[in-house]
Amino acid sequence: MKRISILGVTGSIGTQTLDVLRFHKEDFELVGITANRNIELTLDIIKEFSPKYVAINHEESYKKLVDLVKSEGLKCEVIYGMEGLVKVATLDEIDIVVTSVVGMIGLKPTVEAIRKGKDIALANKETLVVAGELVMREAKENGVKILPVDSEHSAIFQSLQGNAHNKIDKILLTASGGPFRGFTIEDLKSVTPERALKHPKWNMGQKISIDSSTLMNKGLEVIEAHWLFDCSYKDIEVVVHPQSIIHSMVQYTDGAVIAQLGVPDMKLPIQYALNYPNREGNISEKLDLFKIRELTFEKPDLDTFKCLKLAYEAGEKGKLMPTILNGANEVCVELFLNKKITYLQIPEIIEECMNTFDYNKEVTLDNVINLDKEVRQYIYEKYN
């Protein structure tokens, strides 16, 4: 039996991970969880799965949960803040950590978990975006497996099994194209948060839905793929595939292309990461190719969806430039959702930050965290 912690248990990936655990009750024990504000759902999860440790990162919610746990006689330790996240990620009794929190908050607990020798089922792509050099070095030094949960990176990981890494010609990273595929810049001027949140294929949280609409999500995945699979940026090609059936592909030097196909359901890559290297039965729908009938492919429009282009630029410049890109994007998405900036201002402000801040510093935990704070403060003061 594998013992696990889930960081971000009430989010989209977290709740789907719970679905996998319900289906494989004999294979996993949930030891620790973290959440932010959704205390009602957190309480339900505590009652169902009986985790020993629960970390809450929102102060009022933490106090509320402490009272509820006590009044209902539940046996778990409730911990507050970043200290709590790190504790849940580094528990002696766990084997693997599912990092499904959104944004920079996942960095410190993930790094500390790696230093404790815990395998990582990685759904928090920002961790590799801002500190890929540090994370992969720590993973290697501590003998830790980084198992991708993003459907695209899971597909690449699966397509690499049994093949020599030095025989890769390029990685083909698929993208649905988002809700605005085929739009012009003029069309995007009137985009509202409500429209941007309606993804055609995937049911996701707010932040990743906006990122998918701007193609920043794909840009972050390009940087993530660079670190996970040790490929140069020129060998990572984004392919728009509206059906979202092929989750990504690897082309080898002999011309062969190996792909992983499946219905668009995050439970598939979650289960693969948790069960690796084994394959087990799944609650997800099976792929029926006769229903699909056709698969189509397009090149991404980098002029209209500039975020993807900016991500490539940030990745190629390296050092702390991806930290600037990521921090600026997180704040811009928040301001857009709150209707403080327009949709087209998102790439404009990100590019402004990339041209404003010094990125040529060593990638350390402190440098990443400090620069991220500076970038966020700059945008809040100027645009909020």
Swiss-Prot record:
- EC code: 1.1.1.267
Cofactors (names): Mg(2+); Mn(2+)
- On whether rRNA processing is a keyword of this UniProt record, the answer is no
Known pathway: Isoprenoid biosynthesis; isopentenyl diphosphate biosynthesis via DXP pathway; isopentenyl diphosphate from 1-deoxy-D-xylulose 5-phosphate: step 1/6
Residues bound to 1-deoxy-D-xylulose 5-phosphate: 125, 151-152, 176, 199, 212, 217-218, 221
Query: One Pfam annotation, family name?
Result: DXPR_C
Q: What molecular functions are annotated in GO for this chain?
A: 1-deoxy-D-xylulose-5-phosphate reductoisomerase activity; manganese ion binding; NADPH binding
Write down the chemical reaction(s) this protein catalyses: 2-C-methyl-D-erythritol 4-phosphate + NADP(+) = 1-deoxy-D-xylulose 5-phosphate + NADPH + H(+)
Q: Which residues form a coiled coil?
A: none
* Highest taxon of the lineage: Bacteria
Question: Per its UniProt record, what NCBIfam families does this chain match?
Answer: Dxr (TIGR00243), PRK12464.1 (NF009114)
- Which family does the record assign? Belongs to the DXR family.
Task: Tell me the protein's name.
Answer: 1-deoxy-D-xylulose 5-phosphate reductoisomerase
- Species annotation: Clostridium perfringens (strain 13 / Type A)
| Taxonomic lineage from the root | Bacteria, Bacillati, Bacillota, Clostridia, Eubacteriales
